């Protein structure tokens, strides 16, 4: 499935409400009830002086994958819930010197929490 329109919708919403996410230009690769995958390109916007990705961009990607899964679940259940993150945990395995793929596979746990 092509997620071009979902990526464009994400850019439109974030441009207005959360501009820093829009600035990073995330692209949705896969989004369903179980997991979310997105890519953030390494370019002049996201690259630091040592030609690797800023840690803040890593945080945006990690936060956004879980957030998209949660928003999808909330929307599907037609719940009126405001999404506020208390904290999150992410593992960064090495320095990013190219585009980065972010994956969240916690769809079942998120579904359980939204109930």
Annotate each PLM feature:
Residues 23, 111-115:
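A short, acidic/glycine-rich surface segment
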């Amino acid at each position: 499935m092509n997620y071009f329109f979902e990526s464009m919708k994400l850019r439109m919403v974030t441009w207005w409400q959360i501009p820093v996410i829009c600035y990073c230009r995330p692209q949705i690769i896969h989004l369903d009830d179980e997991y979310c995958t997105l890519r953030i390109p390494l370019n002049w916007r996201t690259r630091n002086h040592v030609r690797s990705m800023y840690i803040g961009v890593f945080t945006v990607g990690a936060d956004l994958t879980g957030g998209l899964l949660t928003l999808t679940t909330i929307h599907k259940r037609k719940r009126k819930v405001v999404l506020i993150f208390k904290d999150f945990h992410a593992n960064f395995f090495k320095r990013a010197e190219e585009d980065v793929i972010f994956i969240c596979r916690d769809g079942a746990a998120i579904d359980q929490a939204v109930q």
